[in-house]
């Protein structure tokens, strides 16, 4: 519990390295291996390059509407690094990089955002729930999973995240409160990218430090530079170890900047200036980690170029798999979700089959 705070209002973000990739504290011990750092950089670039391809495909009518992860790659991959493989993840609609870290294949994310139900059929071995669109519901899911882990005395945690705007939802407080009362194994996260669609944080909340919302529930919290991979990893590891130890839940606020649109149906140029975007890009998470890796000779130009080539091939292969995959039938949708159908579900299934047949 080295970096968690109980009641004092934090005034600064927890950071490990600056925009140039230099350690803020030269004596800070990096516990991640070079291979872990390079793998993290690979996944961050996979997420970003895939998002950029998807934006092009969507504009060309080859994909449906989706929510890019641009600007949140470090905090999401950092979250993954701080978890164990038997911990649970309850994603929201902007959790693609975290899901890639957990092992979910790129083609599965493409299937989801192209309206194919197979995109939600995630292999149970990844312990990652399907993408949740309903804002706030994932907090209840994570609280419930934390209850299960606590009840079974399993040394694992359930992790979820929500946007800054989502902290105004009732389920945000309700889930944290009940998890705190019963000391469930849950880590709640806020991905504060400073915009709820077009609404700025100052118009969403009377406090700019969203982590203080944990005080009402009596749980510890930490506010982290979400553009810093290592700080994000250390915060998640610290929080997860605290929660898995039977101490109850934790709240982490990751502070970042949403570089792209809320979704592809949104145009951010309407509500923010180019100058503002350029300022936000100065702390770009991918560039910051690149600076860190190059500065410490963990990665070089040739290795990076080889990495990018591999990523391009992986994305293209995923797209081709998505295109060739067939939509699931109504029977498959119901049979995948329910072991046994109630009379009401049987009726709904018949209505759905008739509707889609027509």
Swiss-Prot record:
SUPFAM superfamilies cross-referenced by the UniProt entry: Thiamin diphosphate-binding fold (THDP-binding) (SSF52518)
Enzyme class, UniProt record, top EC level: oxidoreductase
Cofactor: thiamine diphosphate
Reactions it catalyzes: N(6)-[(R)-lipoyl]-L-lysyl-[protein] + pyruvate + H(+) = N(6)-[(R)-S(8)-acetyldihydrolipoyl]-L-lysyl-[protein] + CO2
Keyword Oxidoreductase found: yes
E.C. designation(s): 1.2.4.1
InterPro entries: Alpha-ketoacid_DH_E1_comp, DH_E1, PdhA/BkdA, THDP-binding
A Gene Ontology biological process term: branched-chain amino acid catabolic process
Pfam families: E1_dh
Keywords: Oxidoreductase, Pyruvate, Thiamine pyrophosphate
Disulfide bonds: none
Transmembrane segments: none
Keyword Oxidoreductase carried by entry: yes
GO function term, MF aspect, one: pyruvate dehydrogenase (acetyl-transferring) activity
Record's subunit section: Heterodimer of an alpha and a beta chain.
Function, as annotated: The pyruvate dehydrogenase complex catalyzes the overall conversion of pyruvate to acetyl-CoA and CO(2). It contains multiple copies of three enzymatic components: pyruvate dehydrogenase (E1), dihydrolipoamide acetyltransferase (E2) and lipoamide dehydrogenase (E3).
Name recorded for this polypeptide: Pyruvate dehydrogenase E1 component subunit alpha
């Amino acid at each position: 519990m080295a970096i968690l705070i109980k009641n004092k209002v934090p005034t600064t973000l927890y950071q490990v390295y600056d925009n140039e990739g230099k350690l803020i504290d030269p004596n800070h011990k990096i516990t991640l291996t070079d291979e872990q750092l390079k793998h993290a950089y690979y996944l961050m670039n996979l997420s970003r390059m895939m998002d950029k391809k998807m934006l092009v495909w969507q504009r060309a009518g080859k994909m449906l509407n989706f929510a890019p992860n641009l600007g949140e790659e470090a905090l999401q991959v950092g979250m993954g690094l701080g978890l164990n493989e038997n911990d649970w993840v309850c994603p929201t609609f902007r959790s693609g990089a975290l899901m890639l870290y957990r092992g979910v294949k790129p083609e599965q994310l493409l299937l989801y955002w192209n309206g194919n139900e197979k995109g939600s059929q995630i292999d149970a071995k990844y312990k990652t729930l399907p993408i949740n669109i309903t804002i706030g519901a994932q907090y209840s899911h994570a609280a419930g999973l934390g209850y299960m882990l606590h009840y079974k005395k399993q040394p694992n945690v359930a992790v979820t995240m929500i946007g800054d705007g989502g902290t105004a939802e009732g389920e945000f407080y309700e889930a944290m409160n009940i998890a705190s009362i019963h000391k469930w194994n849950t880590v709640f996260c806020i991905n504060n990218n400073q915009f709820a669609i077009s609404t700025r944080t100052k118009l969403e909340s009377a406090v700019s430090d969203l982590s203080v919302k944990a005080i009402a529930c009596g749980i510890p919290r930490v506010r982290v530079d979400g553009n810093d991979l290592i700080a994000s990893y250390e915060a998640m590891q610290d929080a997860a170890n605290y929660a898995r130890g039977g101490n109850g839940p934790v709240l982490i606020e990751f502070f970042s900047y949403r570089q792209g649109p809320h979704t592809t149906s949104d145009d951010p140029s309407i509500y923010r200036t180019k100058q503002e975007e350029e300022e936000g890009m100065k702390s770009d998470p991918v560039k910051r980690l690149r600076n860190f890796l190059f500065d410490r000779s963990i990665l070089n130009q040739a290795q990076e170029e080889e990495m990018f080539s591999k990523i391009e091939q992986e994305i293209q292969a995923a797209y081709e798999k998505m295109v060739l995959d067939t939509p699931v039938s109504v029977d498959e949708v119901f049979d995948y979700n329910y072991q046994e159908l109630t009379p009401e579900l049987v009726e709904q299934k018949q209505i759905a089959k008739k509707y889609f047949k027509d």
